Amino acid sequence: MSKTPLLDTIRTPDDLRKLRIDQVQQVADELRQETIDAVSVTGGHFGAGLGVVELTTAIHYVFDTPRDRLIWDVGHQAYPHKILTGRRDRIRTLRTAGGLSGFTKRTESDYDPFGAAHSSTSISAGLGMAVARDLAGGTNNVIAVIGDGSISAGMAYEAMNNAGAMNSRLIVILNDNNMSIAPPVGAMSAYLSRLYSGKTYRSLREAGKQIGKHLPKLIADRAARAEEYSRGFMMGGGTLFEELGFYYVGPIDGHNLDHLLPILQNVRDAETGPFLIHVVTQKGKGYAPAEAASDKYHAVVKFDIATGTQAKAKSNAPSYQNVFGQSLVKEAAKDDKVVGITAAMPSGTGIDIFEKAFPDRTFDVGIAEQHAVTFAAGLATEGFKPFCAIYSTFLQRGYDQIVHDVAIQSLPVRFAIDRAGLVGADGATHAGSFDNAYLGCLPNFVIMAASDEAELVHMVATQVAINDRPSAVRYPRGEGRGVEMPDVGVPLEIGKGRVIRQGNKVALLSFGTRLAECEKAAEELATLGLSTTVADARFMKPLDVDLVIKLANEHEILITIEEGSIGGFGSHVMQTLSDHGKLDGEVKMRAMVLPDVFLDHDTPAAMYAAAGLDAKAIVKKVFEALGKEHAAETVKLA
């Protein structure tokens, strides 16, 4: 007998809406169990999805999705949404090759009107859809669901300020799962929320506003303030949103369908807006291990449902993020000017390690990359040595600040760029594909890439020593190569690479951790009679011009390899060769970069193979440059 009999009858939300209202709770309970079971098989973001099971069910029951547009901010919490919207049969393919995305994705379903993965975009996108509806004479609803972490970012407030000024009929649901704004206050809160979302109250409020326009300004202002304070006193937490022009409803218990359903129905039927519904939920709701340790169950690998034990693979080498964190601790122990900054990702970047040693010198600024960069710039003006540790994909959000506030002023902000290159299961939205290109075009920037974990130690020490300009070191997600680690970092000579293996026919110049694949390729090429030099560039800016020219002069073929897009390291090498007249027939130059597409999720190894950046592809590229036939399937590499 099925454990999910009602859920089994639901193919789309149309089926859900055919059920009686007293059956909705059972659907939610079964949906939670299905979510737990699915993620135990696939891994993925877990706690946030469990926290919005009732909210997801209620939204799809009350609103006419997909005609009514439903936007999930970030998308971590969208797994239950996917199950209810025709994707249950594929839910156990989450984040695997050819399977469902771990986030919302427009090309995946009509029920995903806007793709997500980075935070704080939902209100802006929702407002755009609401305005488009109004211009087209439509009547559908637009609902944006955003978490209390995401709503802290500046973009969310920019959007709310705009929406409030336009009086747009937009519904924003604030999913407060950290109790960071205000807790629900029981039955009275639920009753007042239902009252304030109802038509009678809104009509009276609008009438009051119209009367206020004809009163003397002092009296009108005091009346408005009295109404605002009375609501703030009774409801707790809504004053800011009211100031931005929203009707504030809440806080309400996001796990109580008796509270959620009537409020959503009231708001659905409203003719005015915008609304902000403040819903309080619990991460990991309904699964005891996740409720007890929400941080450990935010994102999980495969796990045993009965025990909660996650099937984590045994580590063979330290992770790059931990090497960075530990290296920064050692440098800070010698230099009290070193500080660490992260934008809501302390454990993901290794800043949590630094925080344990130096809590007073650690700053988590929240989801605020723009602020993080300029905050670091301010610290640098006063002689401090800020390390701004941000994922490559998120650093994009602070690009103007990098240019205007850091680079133009030559301020020595140190950027630790984690998750550089392809990241695997999180796919295109989280890939660190572009930082070589978007930083490489900036004057007076030192840009490094660690080829292994030992090199990262030295590059952190190098950054500490750079006091006259900004610097960046990029490194990938995951474990290092298992190389011997230095006790302390030693600053590298700026702008100088190193030769790993000497040959005379082919030169492979690597920037970053593709060095290991270059070494594999060199071994294979040697068995095929091609003497191959392997070099580690270390620096993209300033580039080791002497090394580049030497490689070009002494080899028939020069190939660059990087874990980045077009416009990055290879482009800098080609510009140097062009400047020195080395592209006039003297050397066959090839640049191996990520393909000019957004790659879908898979394992990192599979993604690099698909991108043509593994050892097999390097060997093939060499023979293509030589003009000799060499079928890819004959290349046998370990």
UniProtKB/Swiss-Prot annotation:
Keywords: Isoprene biosynthesis, Magnesium, Metal-binding, Thiamine biosynthesis, Thiamine pyrophosphate, Transferase
Cofactors (names): Mg(2+); thiamine diphosphate
CDD domains found in the cross-reference section: TPP_DXS, TPP_PYR_DXS_TK_like
Chain positions recorded as thiamine diphosphate binding sites: 76, 117-119, 149-150, 177, 287, 369
Subunit field text: Homodimer.
This protein's name: 1-deoxy-D-xylulose-5-phosphate synthase
One matching Pfam family: Transket_pyr
GO MF annotation list: 1-deoxy-D-xylulose-5-phosphate synthase activity; magnesium ion binding; thiamine pyrophosphate binding
Enzyme class: transferase
Cofactor: binding comment: Binds 1 Mg(2+) ion per subunit.
Function: Catalyzes the acyloin condensation reaction between C atoms 2 and 3 of pyruvate and glyceraldehyde 3-phosphate to yield 1-deoxy-D-xylulose-5-phosphate (DXP).
EC number(s) on file: 2.2.1.7
Record's catalysed reaction(s): D-glyceraldehyde 3-phosphate + pyruvate + H(+) = 1-deoxy-D-xylulose 5-phosphate + CO2
Domain of life the protein comes from: Bacteria
Organism: Rhodopseudomonas palustris (strain HaA2)
Similarity comment: Belongs to the transketolase family. DXPS subfamily.
Pathways per UniProt: Metabolic intermediate biosynthesis; 1-deoxy-D-xylulose 5-phosphate biosynthesis; 1-deoxy-D-xylulose 5-phosphate from D-glyceraldehyde 3-phosphate and pyruvate: step 1/1
InterPro entries listed in its UniProt record: Dxylulose-5-P_synthase, THDP-binding, Transketo_C/PFOR_II, Transketolase-like_Pyr-bd, Transketolase_BS, Transketolase_C, Transketolase_CS
GO biological process, one term: terpenoid biosynthetic process
Binding site for Mg(2+): 148, 177
UniProt-listed SUPFAM superfamilies: Thiamin diphosphate-binding fold (THDP-binding), TK C-terminal domain-like
HAMAP family for the chain: DXP_synth
Intrachain disulfide bonds: none
